[in-house]
C-alpha cells in the first residue's frame, strides 16, 4: 500500500512538471489574446469627406482649408489651441523652480540647439501656418494646420523653411477630401525626423516603423498588429497622452505599457514582481536603432570649416554624415544597447538663461533613485556633444542658425559664430558679452519603442551577472542578486548552505546509527528467544 501511494504521488508530480514545461503562454494568456483582438479590428471611417461640397473647391491658401474644417468641426480648433502641439509648451511643476512653462519656446537641446530665432525652419514641425519669428499669433484659429495630422492621402508635406506652410506642390483640395484619423505617416512626418533627419534624435522612432516586421517592433509591424501611434497615445479633446522628456518635466499624462498590459502581464509571479522596480521597456527593448543609425554625439565646436570657401560634408560607409560645415561632427550607432537609469517620471530642464552649474551640463536631468518608491529602471539613449555658451554670463547661447541670404548673421550661411550669437540672443532677449566658447552637454532620451518579440527579451543573466558588461553594471546604490556582494548576506547564505549539508549528514548519520543499534537489538532479541527455546 505504501509503495502504491508513493508511485501515485510521483506520477502526479511528474505530470505537473511536464504540464508546466509544455504549456503555451500564448494559449493561456487570455488578456493578451483579448488585446490582440481589440487592435486587430481597425476603425473604418463612416464619413467620406470627398462628398462634402465645401471641400470640393480649389483652395487658395491652407488657411481656407482650416476655415472649411471648422465650419463643421466647430469647436475642435479650440481644443487644438490648448494643446502643447500648438503652444510648444506646457505648464508644469519643475522641481526647484515651481510652476513654470517649458517647451520648444524656451528649452535647449544638444541637436539643433533651439527653435527660438530659427522659427522659419523649425516651424516645419509646428501644427500651424506662418511661424516666421517669435511673434506668432497663437490666438488666430485660421493658422491651425488640420491637414498635417489628419491627411490620409500621404500627399501632404510641409515646405522646407516656409514657416510651417505646406509645400507648393501640395494639392490642398485633394488633401482636404482625404482626411481621417491620424496615422503613423502623420505622426512620423515630425517625430521620425527630429534633429534634422531620420532617426537622428530618438533612436527608436524612425521611418522604418512605417513598414517594419515584428523583429523591429511588435506593435507597429506591418506583419503584426500594425498599430498606429494613437492606439497608445490617445488624444481626448486633442490632449495627447505621452511625454517627451527633452521638453517635459512632470509625472502626469504619460502613456504607459500598463494601460494595456496591466501590472501583472506574466504567468510567472517572480517576473511580475520585477515590475515594482523595473520598467517593461528595460526588458522588452534590448536594442534600438535596429534599421537605420541614430546620432549619438554632435560637436558644434568643429563646425564652420570650409573647402575653397564653400561648406562641405563627409559621409561614412553607410551614407551618414559624420561631418558637415553647418553643424560640425557626429557619431552614429545602429543596433545600440541602451544605457539604464532610475526614473520617477519627473525631470529638471535647462531653460534659456539658466546659469551653467555643472560640467558636463545635463540638459534634461531625469530624477530617480532606488530608494524612491516611484522610480523604475528604464532604458535610455545618452546623447553627448558640445555647444556654444557665453563665457562671461556663463549661459548657453541660442544662436541664429537659419537664414535666407548672406549677411543676415545666420551661422548656416555666414559661418560667423559671434554674429550668429549676437543675433540669436537679441531675439530671445538675453545678454551676450561677445565672448564665447563651447561646453560639453548631455541629454537623456528614454527608449520606449522598437519593442522586441518576447523570445528576444533581455535574459535574466544579462543583468544578474558579475561580468563588467552586464546591462546594469553601471547602476549602483542597491543590491542586485547575482551581481553584488554583501558580506553579512553572503556569510549567512554560505552558513545556511553548509549548515544544511551538515544537517543532512548528521541526520543521515543518526539514521544509520539508529538503524545499526536497532539491528543489534533485534539480533539480541532473536538470540535470547533462541536460548529460551533450547
Predicted regions and their residues:
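Sequence context of c-type cytochrome heme-c attachment sites
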Residues: 2-183, 189-254, 258-272, 382-384, ...
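Alpha-helical transmembrane segments
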Residues: 18-20, 500-515
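Soluble extramembrane regions of membrane proteins in the secretory/endomembrane system
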Residues: 71, 320, 324-462, 466-467
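Alpha-helical scaffold segments in carbohydrate-active enzymes
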Residues: 148-152, 189, 279-289, 462
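Feature representing long, continuous alpha-helical segments
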Residues: 230, 255-258, 278-281, 458-461, ...
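Repeat-solenoid scaffold signature
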Residues: 253-359, 364
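N-terminal membrane-entry
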Residues: 487-497
Amino acid at each position: 500500500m505504501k509503495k502504491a501511494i508513493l508511485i501515485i504521488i510521483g506520477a502526479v508530480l511528474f505530470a505537473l512538471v511536464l504540464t508546466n514545461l509544455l504549456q503555451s503562454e500564448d494559449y493561456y494568456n487570455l488578456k493578451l489574446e483579448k488585446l490582440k483582438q481589440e487592435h486587430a479590428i481597425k476603425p473604418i471611417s463612416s464619413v467620406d469627406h470627398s462628398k462634402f461640397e465645401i471641400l470640393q473647391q480649389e483652395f487658395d491658401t491652407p488657411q481656407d482649408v482650416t476655415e472649411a474644417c471648422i465650419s463643421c468641426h466647430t469647436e475642435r480648433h479650440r481644443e487644438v489651441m490648448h494643446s502643447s502641439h500648438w503652444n510648444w509648451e506646457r505648464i508644469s511643476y519643475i522641481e526647484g523652480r515651481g510652476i513654470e512653462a517649458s517647451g520648444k519656446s524656451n528649452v535647449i537641446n544638444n541637436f539643433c540647439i533651439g527653435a527660438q530665432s530659427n522659427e522659419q525652419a523649425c516651424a516645419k514641425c509646428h501644427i500651424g501656418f506662418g511661424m516666421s519669428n517669435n511673434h506668432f499669433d497663437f490666438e488666430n484659429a485660421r493658422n491651425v494646420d488640420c491637414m498635417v495630422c489628419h491627411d490620409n492621402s500621404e500627399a501632404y508635406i510641409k515646405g522646407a523653411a516656409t514657416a510651417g506652410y505646406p509645400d507648393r506642390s501640395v494639392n490642398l483640395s485633394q488633401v482636404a477630401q482625404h482626411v481621417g484619423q491620424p496615422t503613423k505617416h502623420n505622426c512620423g512626418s515630425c517625430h521620425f525626423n527630429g534633429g534634422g533627419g531620420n532617426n537622428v534624435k530618438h533612436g527608436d522612432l524612425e521611418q522604418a516603423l512605417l513598414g517594419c516586421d515584428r523583429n523591429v517592433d511588435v506593435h507597429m509591424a506591418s506583419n503584426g498588429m500594425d498599430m498606429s501611434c494613437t492606439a497608445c497615445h490617445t488624444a481626448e479633446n486633442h490632449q495627447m497622452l505621452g511625454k517627451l522628456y527633452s521638453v517635459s518635466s512632470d509625472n502626469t499624462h504619460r502613456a504607459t505599457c500598463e494601460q494595456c498590459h496591466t501590472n501583472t502581464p506574466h504567468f510567472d509571479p517572480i517576473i511580475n514582481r520585477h515590475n515594482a522596480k523595473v520598467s517593461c521597456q528595460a526588458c522588452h527593448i534590448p536594442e534600438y536603432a535596429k534599421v537605420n543609425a541614430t546620432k549619438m554625439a554632435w560637436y558644434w565646436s568643429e563646425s564652420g570649416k570650409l573647402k575653397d570657401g564653400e561648406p562641405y560634408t563627409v559621409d561614412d560607409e553607410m551614407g551618414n554624415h559624420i561631418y558637415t560645415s553647418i553643424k560640425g561632427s557626429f557619431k552614429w550607432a545602429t543596433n545600440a544597447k541602451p544605457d539604464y537609469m532610475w526614473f520617477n517620471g519627473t525631470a529638471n530642464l535647462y531653460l534659456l538663461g539658466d546659469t551653467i552649474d555643472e560640467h558636463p551640463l545635463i540638459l534634461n536631468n531625469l530624477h530617480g533613485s532606488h530608494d524612491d518608491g516611484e522610480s523604475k529602471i528604464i532604458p535610455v539613449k545618452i546623447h553627448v556633444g558640445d555647444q556654444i555658451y557665453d563665457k562671461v554670463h556663463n549661459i548657453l547661447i541660442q544662436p541664429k542658425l537659419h537664414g535666407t541670404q548672406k549677411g543676415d548673421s545666420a551661422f548656416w550661411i555666414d559661418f560667423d559664430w559671434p554674429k550668429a550669437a549676437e543675433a540669436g540672443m537679441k531675439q530671445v532677449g538675453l545678454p551676450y558679452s561677445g565672448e564665447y566658447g563651447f561646453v560639453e552637454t548631455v541629454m537623456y532620451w528614454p527608449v520606449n519603442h522598437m519593442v522586441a518579440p518576447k523570445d528576444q527579451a533581455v535574459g535574466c543573466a544579462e543583468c544578474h551577472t558579475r561580468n563588467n558588461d552586464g546591462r546594469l553594471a553601471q547602476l549602483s546604490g542597491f543590491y542586485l542578486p547575482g551581481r553584488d556582494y554583501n558580506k553579512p548576506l553572503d556569510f549567512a547564505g554560505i552558513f545556511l548552505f553548509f549548515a544544511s549539508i551538515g544537517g543532512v549528514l548528521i541526520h543521515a548519520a543518526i539514521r544509520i546509527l539508529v538503524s545499526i543499534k536497532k539491528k543489534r537489538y533485534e539480533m539480541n532479541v532473536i538470540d535470547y528467544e533462541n536460548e529460551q527455546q533450547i
